[in-house]
Amino acid sequence: MVSKLSLFRANSLPFPVISSYSARFILKPYPKPKTLIFCVFSSNLSSTTFPYGPSLLKGKKPVLDDIRLASIGRDRDAHRGKIGEFDESIEKDVLLNEDEFTRVFEISAIRVPAKDCFALENRLRGHLLNWPRIRNIARVPGDEIEEDVVKLLGRETDEEEEDEDSVVDSVNRRIRGKAEGDGERLSSVLHRDKLARTFNSTGYLKFRNLAKISRPKRKRKTERTREGKEKEIASRRNEMAVVEVVETRGGEEDFEGLLGEGYGSRGRWRGSTRLLLLDEKYSGEEVQDLPEAIKVLFAEAKMADASLSFELVKCRLTLFYDYWPMIEILEAVLPKGMIVPSAFEMVGHIAHLNLRDEHLPYKRLIAKVVLDKNQPKIQTVVNKIDPIHNDFRTMQLEVLAGNHSLVTLVVENGLRFHVDLARVYWNSKLGTERQRLLLGFDQNDVVCDVFAGVGPIALAAARIVKRVYANDLNPHAVEFMEQNSVVNKLEKRIEIFNMDGRRFIKAMFSSEKGQKVTQVVMNLPKDAAESLDAFRGVYNDRHRDEGLSFPTIHVYGFSKASDPEFDFHERIRIALSEVAVDVKMRKVRLVAPGKWMLCASFILPKNVAFSRKNLSYVD
């Protein structure tokens, strides 16, 4: 069944779904995708204008033969390996068939000598393919042959072979210190001195890359398959693109029976060659129909040396699933008109998605594409199920693809943080804001972090300031913060507490430690502003004339008001029971439509610190 392209916007492909119980197509997108997903494209492309470059709509789909259908079973096994411990019931919900994204493009190419390919590439740059992630210079089987086979084919060249005697003389001079005709042999002392001059402390002076060149190559694991063709297809699938020569112009000898596949109609061997891939608009053209620059190239080659292997060939460029970017795959998979989830947060090896309700029927399909297109950096894809409501600010996450490990390592501001997203809170989007806050600290400061989490601010500040006092209510966060302080060798510069934020403020400022605190950070946007009431009366047991210093407080909060700065300022004044509070307000980021995250910085007012309106704290 063929759908009309005029109904679809560019680069958006509706995917009908094939049920595992029926082979009929379902034209309307079903809310829950099943088993294998296939594309339907229009066969009438002449009336549609496509942008330059490759597209899933422009290429031809290869015909699925028996071997390619058999490879789908390998895809299913590979899928099981990628999703780790997922149940088979989950796997049956959706399986993306990567073969459906293979596209074949018919193009033309010029076969040129390998030694001239880079110069010719610069000369013909405007007439070459110039597709993203596709090199204009391509290699195919048969462009290089071993020397023994070249002699068998009878190479015609004017270049003289290197004299074997000169090679022997060079070896003798290197090993024995002399060669025939050099006169007397060097003494052992002079020979060692001569060799020593070619060395330095790092190895060979004249051959600095000798150690790298001499290093043995890595052994690659080869898959064992029953048939050679299956092995060839499996190796191709690991590549983004493959170029094959389909047809050459002119009569030539066929060496396929002698040398095997890939060494077909090549004529007499004239040396190493490469392919210069021409623009797709020149596909199927003869030499006389090509641009003048290319015709001049052929004319110059013919006049200079008739033995040069300049010839126009017809090629087949195959682009596999790995070539297409994530956005294009998702646009093809999701129904027409649906917003493509293109952005996600990275926490170590974990990709954190925030999918809309319309994406939920396709969540595992989306997660697989995200995992495939971002490996090996991404090994786990999760989605937040519900908004954050608990006191520990931990998120309810659902693992959609990859392994189930939510313990990861995050590097920020040159520090390493071990986090477990299932038990602690972490937001990579606030990395820039944390860095901005740290720029306001100096070596004379003493920092008190009331809601420290796993320590992104506290540990980073410990490298700058005199002392850091960090606290968090979540015992798991405290455990990870202690571990991170040891990992980053900062355990001697930070003191960690596990208690409620209000009680921590009261206990800290009622002790001698609180007298030295110059900076207070309260990064808990949901409740931090309301926790400011804990500062009322913190200096009641001291005299007003002691010359006390009052800390600068940095408090974060959310606001959905039309004027978020005014709303947040009012909440701060209400919590402190003080009207005259000079606050520096700053918008941090837009969390959701109409919801801002803000940062307010102010010096603790003297009237608040000596207020007699003490609160009674309840366990």
UniProtKB/Swiss-Prot annotation:
Q: Where in the cell is it found?
A: Mitochondrion matrix; Nucleus; Cytoplasm
One CC-aspect GO term? nucleus
- The record lists the organism as Arabidopsis thaliana
Name of the protein: tRNA (guanine(37)-N(1))-methyltransferase 2
Q: Which domain of life is it from?
A: Eukaryota
Q: Where does S-adenosyl-L-methionine bind?
A: 434, 472-473, 500-501, 523
Gene Ontology BP terms: tRNA methylation
In terms of InterPro entries, this protein maps to:
MeTrfase_TRM5/TYW2, SAM-dependent_MTases_sf, TRM5-TYW2-like_MTfase, TRM5/TYW2-like_N, tRNA_Gua_MeTrfase_euk
Q: Indicate the quaternary assembly.
A: Monomer.
Offer an example of a GO molecular function term for this protein. tRNA (guanine(37)-N1)-methyltransferase activity
**EC annotation from Swiss-Prot or TrEMBL:** 2.1.1.228
Q: Which UniProt keywords apply?
A: Cytoplasm, Methyltransferase, Mitochondrion, Nucleus, S-adenosyl-L-methionine, Transferase, Transit peptide, tRNA processing
Among SUPFAM superfamilies, the record links this protein to: S-adenosyl-L-methionine-dependent methyltransferases (SSF53335)
